[in-house]
Amino acid sequence: MNTQLPTAIIGGGPVALAAAAQLVKRNMPFILFERGAYIASSILSWKHVRMFSPWEFNMDTAAKELLMETGWTAPAKDHMPTGVELVNEYLLPLSQLDQLQPFIQLQSSVKAIYRKGFDKMKTAGRDTASFIIEYEQHGKLLREEAASVIDATGTWLKPNPMSTSGHPAEGEIQNKNHIQYGIPDILGADKQRYAGKNIVVVGSGHSAIQSLTLLNELKLENPETTIHWVLRKKKVAEAFGGGENDGLPARGALGTRANQYVQQGNVQVHTPFLIDRIKKESETITLYGTKLDKAYSIDKIDEVIVATGARPDFSFLSELRYAADTSVESVPQLADLIDPNIHSCGTVRPHGEAELRQPEKDFYIVGSKSYGRAPTFLLATGYEQVRSVVAALAGDFKAAREVQLHLPETGVCSVSRSTEISDNSNSCCTTTPKKMSIRPIAVTSMSSGCCSSNNASTSCETDTGC
């Protein structure tokens, strides 16, 4: 590897910045490309959501060391940050350090990565050729040369569609004005969009339950709000997760909370409903599909929230020799550890550079993108990945091999549970707006103690968002 050239980091989220910090600690040059106007721009799309892992698991060691040198005070390790807190209190100060800020390219969308003078077919001399990063910035196509590449772009920007085929349902694209993907700011910026409306949430994971939590609170304030929950699972109890058995209590509480909403009748469940068509009917839409192999539909729907996961984008890697599992689309050696067809939660053993190694020398896919379509990624895993990868790039193979990772047990995430489980710590409060700011970004979050959007947790722990 040409040590005079920088390592190119693609992405500007927590794992990407951790990679930068690790490179700084080893006095290795880097250049980082963030497609958004601000660092960690994808996280700001779920700024209102509280993570279910505390600060202890959300900060990289090398990054903390660099910050501490400036007099920065670390947040309480047992506090669970919201997305805006993650940016405000950690990622933004990190990105503004003198060792990082000059080498961060914002509003830089990477279009292609390839070996200098090589297409995918050519082999002789390939491993010693530098990488070329083609990126668009302010309407111009630019190029940067790099010795190695760390792809930490995550999956947040490529949400899965609502259909079961993996392709958009018929009419899904045409009716996009009625659809939002991920976790909307239901109690904040998007409140008027959902208050008093007939709403469908599609999905069975943490993000779907998070949206149900926020909608349930909205319904307490606006009783005319109607909530439908569409799942592909045969029984709704399969989505309730491990509850008190989960090593992250806030994550376990999500399923308990969802069960409570169903038992109280605040959420109407449709399962297993397989959507294949959406049709506009006057000012509303109708969802068509099958339930237990029979035609089924839900009509007069105002809004749909699709929380069916996300997938990696490989389009800009077409001239590199990369490998991805054929089903999970993860780094191949991780597939059997995280495949949701095999594991309900995916507690993954510690792994590093050796498992992440690609056919293309000095190219690595890390962070949530390394997990492909699997939904169980935690930031602490990504931090250990990049520590090991950077050690290998530095030639410190001993450190790269010594992979150690402390994670909470994920608990039992797919079990048969009694439908009588409930959470007595239900609604208790009303929301009070609180103004928060990130230099130079102004945002508004909701804070209300035990039942605001700040109290509900999710699995938004990806490198560019969640």
Regions found by a protein language model. Give the residues of each.
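A Rossmann-like FAD-binding core segment of flavoenzymes
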Residues: 216-325, 391, 397-409
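Feature captures the FAD/FMN-dependent oxidoreductase FAD-binding
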Residues: 73-148, 152-157, 276-287, 300-303
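C-terminal, flexible cofactor-proximal segment of oxidoreductases
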Residues: 311, 326-466
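Extreme N-terminal leader/targeting segments of oxidoreductases
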Residues: 1-7, 25, 122-124, 157-187, ...
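Glycine-rich active-site loop/strand segments that organize a redox cofactor
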Residues: 36-90, 176, 182-188, 229-249, ...
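Active-site substrate-recognition segment that forms the wall
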Residues: 54, 198-238, 350-374, 378-393
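N-terminal Rossmann-like FAD-binding beta1-loop-alpha1 element of flavoenzymes
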Residues: 4-32, 201-218
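Glycine-rich dinucleotide-binding loop and its adjacent helix/turn
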Residues: 151-221, 227, 328-336, 345-352
